[in-house]
A protein has these predicted regions:
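Flexible, glycine-rich loop/tail regions that form catalytic "lids" or insertion modules at the edges
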Residues: 1-249
Length: 249
């Protein structure tokens, strides 16, 4: 150690991070264009709600009637009604990213079905086959992964943070289950999500989806209210986004 008078720190913006630059103030002042053409949007809406057997366009998988109706209604939201609910807007956000070769990973305690039975990203056919429609929109698409995690916010968010660090070109999401319980992961949020770039010059693109706020559900069910996270904002370290319409997805 005495023979080495200086130490060099290698930039982390190498390897898989080589195409990423540091954020600037202007990045937080304007939104980039993220839309797709109406034609592509309609096409993806049909593909992402198609329940036919993979590799056999003429053979349709048999699902519970309510699931088939749900996916039929989702398709009609785009092709007929021209009005999307929250679940379909989220579905289309993922579909467009997948079509642009951006992998999407979603995990949480009830992420496959969705806490309010709204997502149904993983559906089960009558022969017990698991089917993820978003993985069948095209042959050259990116991968959609959705996992129902175990009951440990601290451990799961820590894992997803590490996954996002290794895969900066993917969208990695940790979803708090109903009631939030985000405070169970507070150490990861404080020490890594909010401050790793300042402390260790390490950026990370993990997204925390916290669908609830202060709704009178009790002390353990209101931990994701927005002011808790606003207090951790400094030097453009993160964005706090309050979605008020399905279009915000």
């Amino acid at each position: 150690a005495k023979q080495q008078e200086t130490a060099s720190v290698t930039s982390f913006l190498e390897g898989v991070w080589s195409g990423v630059r540091r954020s600037e103030s202007k990045d937080f002042e304007e939104s980039p264009q993220t839309g797709v053409s109406i034609k592509k949007f309609i096409d993806l809406s049909k593909r992402s709600t198609d329940l036919h057997k993979p590799g056999s366009p003429g053979e349709k998988l048999k699902f519970f009637a309510k699931i088939e109706k749900l996916y039929e209604n989702r398709r009609k939201m785009v092709t007929e009604n021209k009005s999307l609910d929250w679940a379909m807007a989220e579905n289309m956000a993922y579909a467009t990213l997948l079509s642009q070769n951006c992998n999407v990973r979603l995990s949480g305690q009830d992420s496959g079905r969705g806490t309010f039975s709204q997502r149904h990203a993983i559906i089960t056919a009558e022969d017990n086959t698991k089917y993820v429609p978003l993985n069948h929109i095209s042959e050259d698409q990116a991968t959609f992964e959705v996992y129902n995690s175990f009951l440990s916010e601290y451990g799961v968010l820590g894992f997803e943070y590490g996954y996002a660090y290794a895969s900066p070109n993917s969208l990695t999401i940790w979803e708090a289950q109903f009631g939030d319980f985000a405070n169970g992961a507070q150490i990861v949020i404080d020490q890594f999500v909010a401050s790793s770039e300042t402390k260790w010059q390490r950026m990370n693109g993990v997204v925390l989806m916290l669908p609830h706020g202060h709704e009178g559900q009790g002390p353990e069910h209101t931990s994701a209210r927005i002011e808790r996270f606003l207090t951790l904002c400094a030097d453009n370290n993160k964005q706090i986004i309050n979605c008020t319409t399905p279009a915000n997805f």
